[in-house]
Curated annotation (Swiss-Prot):
Full protein name: G/U mismatch-specific DNA glycosylase
Any one GO cellular component localisation term in the record: cytoplasm
Annotated organism of origin: Pectobacterium atrosepticum (strain SCRI 1043 / ATCC BAA-672) (Erwinia carotovora subsp. atroseptica)
Known function: Excises ethenocytosine and uracil, which can arise by alkylation or deamination of cytosine, respectively, from the corresponding mispairs with guanine in ds-DNA. It is capable of hydrolyzing the carbon-nitrogen bond between the sugar-phosphate backbone of the DNA and the mispaired base. The complementary strand guanine functions in substrate recognition. Required for DNA damage lesion repair in stationary-phase cells.
Keyword check for Iron: no
Amino acid sequence: MITDILAMNLQVVFCGINPGLSTAHHGYHFANPNNRFWKVIHQAGFTERLLTPAEEQHLLDTGCGITMLVERPTVEATELGRDELLQGGNAIVEKMTRYQPRALAVLGKQAFSQAFGIKKVSWGRQERRIGETQVWVLPNPSGLNRATLESLVASYQELHQALQDNV
């Protein structure tokens, strides 16, 4: 069972779509060796060193957390139903209202669109807020995403810099 890594007043909560089978098997977020999440957040400046999935609880020490839209593991996120994503969006709103991080970073444009019922979504900071929490949409670091490591890091650095600048 994959559990949220959450605490009050974090800098950012990264919101994955759902666990892949490798993640579900290992019991840690972003555990598939092809997933670039841990490398990306390190290179973007969120962690001082490269963490392994087994060290996910150390994220709290850096002001970061992790949650997911849907808890059901699948091979690909495309296997998720629309209702599952909408329910996930509602659950995320409840969690963010409760924990009040400075930012929520949803990892995937299509997942964000479906979970929050927003048709046109751009990358980066969104107009929508959840209470005082800024909402961002960042590219998914999955190995299935063709984005380069450099472009992923640049997107995540934009969020990191905005948080550093108190924007």
